[in-house]
Amino acid sequence: MYEIKESDWKIFRKKIIGWQENYMQKLNKEYIEILQRDENPAKNFWDLENRIFHDKKSVGVVIDMRRSMMFNNILSLLNEETIQLDDLNDFSEEFQNDIKDVVNMLG
């Protein structure tokens, strides 16, 4: 299991709120676009309902805030494009490098 430094854990707890708010703001704009389509109103409604059903499970919306999950949560946030590697600049160099190594391995 990956050992998270206290300093990285503190940074993560501070940043996650803003990351999630930004992600949900992006989602809200996309939801508005769905509702404003020139489609059947029922289709727009059900498309939006389906989209929200899937989005509400993403780490960018709801997160398991355990220190032991932080590394995996960061990887999920990157995968979902909630954050970019540049968003990790405040974290320790070791943590950034470990994340980059896994991202490169996963392709």
Please state what every model-predicted region is:
Residues 1-107:
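Acidic, Ser/Pro/Thr-rich low-complexity regulatory regions
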